[in-house]
Every structure is written in structure tokens, then in C-alpha cells.
Amino acid sequence: MGSQVRLVIAVCGIYATFLTWSLAQEPLTTSVWPNSAARFSHSSFIVLCQALTAAVVGLCYLKAQRSGYGAREFIRKHWADVAGISLTQALSAPAANHSLQYVDYVGYMLAKSCKLLPIMLVHVLVYRTPIGRDKALVGVLVSGGVALFTLGGAERKQGEASLYGLGMLLVSLFLDGLTNASQDRLLRRPASKKITGAHLMVALNTAIVLWNLAYLVLFDRTQWQGSLQQLHADPAILTYLFTYCACGALGQCFVFFTLEHYSSLVLATVTVTRKMVSMLLSIVVYGHSVRPVQWLGILVVFGGIIWETVKKGQRGSGQKSKQH
């Protein structure tokens, strides 16, 4: 199978799984369920279910590769990296899900599309890498667009709650930046045995399961009990939860496949465009009202992201022509 055909299959897989995933996520976390008269806001329980499903699917993915490098051996050799990456990932998801209680879903998706911001912060604060003027300009555009959209909503909640939700989104974005940078470094690290995307998928999701189990058992047993009680009272939640977990797990297979076999630029482009479609789909399906100032925010963010993507493509083409 040719490289282009594989890429098309991967892109279609990412779109199909994560578009369905996003449609299941919104009612799962924001609907007030009839029997319990409450939202299913148990973020750590949701992440636990998602990670457990992804670990099982990832193990099947790794077995299908027949690489001869098992998940246990990989985890033993790289347990420190796996623990660190999974911790930032485990903390990011509950923060993002929790923010949905205070900001609307389209604002959430818009913020999660801004991958440039956490990457810039990680490079400046963690790796002490200078940021060029182009990237700084895009960062300003993205920040301004997010602020316009999030603070310009038609139906505003209390000011403190909205600012709190925005703060939780920013924390989640920064943790995403740490996660992505560390994943990329581990995947491309020289090793005696080849590390694949399937190895990362199994190891990271297994660790996330352990992190969340420890949290629920040691610090928040009421969340575990509340989750089970609400699922018993409103069994319809299970349909959305299963769809959310299954689509997320299958989507991770395509994501790690793309990251392993193609450049991070390709994956970023696919991810950003998928999130754009998710936002527009959410507006159409769930009838969100969007003010003109919010549309301006969307245009500013997407304009900055697309401009940065074009600039990266031009730089890549220039480097290739120099090599020839």
C-alpha cells in the first residue's frame, strides 16, 4: 500500500472517529440527565474509562504489528518517561472536561485547537528555547481570538465562573504542550529496539488508568460512587460513554500511526482541521448561537493557525530545494 493511500486512510480514520467522539462528548458532559437531575461531571471517571478502553485497543494494535518488542518490556525500560508523560496527560483531560461546566463546547473546542500556545510556553518556560517573531505573532492572534470568542458569548454565566473555566482551559493546554513535546522526544529517541506509536498508546493509557484509579481511591471516592449511582439512575449515559470511549480509542490508533509514519506537521494539520469541523458540526447539530464578535474570534484563530501552517510548508519547501 502506497504512502499516500495510507495517509488518506489515517486522515479519514481520524475524522470519522473524532467527529463522532466530539458529538458524544458534548451531551455526555453538559446535559442534565432526567432521572438524576444532574450533569455527568465525573471527569476522572470518564478519563479512566477512556484510558482503559484505549489501553485494550492499543494492546491489540501492538499485537497486530508483531514487532517482537512487548509492552511490558517497553514500560520497564522507559517507566520514568511513561510516568511523567502520562501524569501531564492524566491531569490535562480532567481539567479540560471540568472546564465544560463553565465555558460552552464551541469555546472549548476553539481553545483546544490552539496547539501553538502550549508549544510556545513549553519551549520558553521548560526548554528555554527562543521563539521567533512569526510564532510570537501567531501566538498573539490565537490568544486574541480565544479571548474574543470565550468572553463574547451570547449567554454569559457569572464572571468568576467564566474566568475560572478559561483558566482551567489554559492549564489543560499547557499540560497538552508538555505531553506532546515529551511524546515526540521519546518516539524519536535512539534505542536498541524501535519504539512505535502502539507502544506509546499502550503504555501511556495504562499509566493513566493507574493514576486515575489512585486518585479515585485515595482522594475522591465519592466521585467513583457518584458515577456508578448516576449510571444506574440514567442508563442512557452508558450509550454516550461507550461511544466516547470507543471512538477515542480507535482515533488514538490513527493518531499514533500518523505521528509514527509521517511528520508532526501533517498530524497537526489534520488535527486542527478536524477540530474546525467539530466546532462547526457542534453549531449545526446542537444549535449553538454565535455572536458576530465570536465569529471574528474564530476567524482570527483559524487565520493565525492556517498562516502558521503555510509558513511551515514554505520553510520546508525551501529547505528541500536547498538540499537539491
From Swiss-Prot:
The chain crosses the membrane at residues 7-27, 42-62, 106-126, 135-155, 161-181, 199-219, 237-257, 265-285, 290-310. It comes from the Eukaryota. One of its GO terms (biological process) is UDP-galactose transmembrane transport. Glycans are attached at residue 97. Its main location: endoplasmic reticulum. SUPFAM superfamilies: Multidrug resistance efflux transporter EmrE (SSF103481). This is UDP-galactose transporter homolog 1. It comes from Eremothecium gossypii (strain ATCC 10895 / CBS 109.51 / FGSC 9923 / NRRL Y-1056).
